[in-house]
Amino acid sequence: MDWSCYSTVIPYNYLLNPDGIILPYGSIIKNVENIEKLFGNKIFIKPNSPWKAFTGFSTSLDNLFYELNSITQLEKVNKSELTLISSHKQIDNTEFRFWCINEEIITYAPYTWQHNEVYSELPEDAIHFVYQILSYLYEYTDNGIVIDIVNTPNGLKLIELNALSTSGWYRGMDVDRLLKKLKEW
């Protein structure tokens, strides 16, 4: 689900990037001065779409041209690709993915982008937080949805929503339970 869609139904205090703006990928460099006025020198960029034209990343504005040029060459990103730009946020190294069907959490697993990282334990209020998110998504959850959350200095935050069919699986998830629910579904 596009950030521009779910950010309109999820309360802003639940979102990791509530301050985000949307720009076409090809317009980012032309808007560096405006981006700096809004967010300072360190920003986060990711595709608006869950189809992942590229992986989201944080960067300084000093490195922005290099980062975008690298992505353009490696990923062949279309200049019209809508892109979320927001301020950089401090987050835990461990993120949590929840696979949900019909407003029910089927399974979850931790994941991290850091090599040799020891996973954090699931925060005590994480399951309640995900059910709160699901309550705002009642129009969308009958299709199955994946919810990624992370702990921050300001509490749990929603990183993004994705489809079951476009999301990776991680060690620790209950694959058998998910497959059984998918078969019943």
Model segments located where?
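Active-site nucleotide/adenylate-binding loops and adjacent lid/helix of ATP-dependent enzymes
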Residues: M1-L137
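Short, flexible loop/turn elements at secondary-structure junctions
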Residues: S49, K89-Q90, N151-P153, N162-S165
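A short beta-strand motif that forms the metal-chelation/ATP-contact edge
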Residues: W99-C100, T107, G155-W169
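A long amphipathic alpha-helix within ATP-dependent nucleotide-binding catalytic cores
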Residues: A109-L158, R177-W185
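Acidic, proline/glycine-rich low-complexity IDRs
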Residues: N143, G168-M173
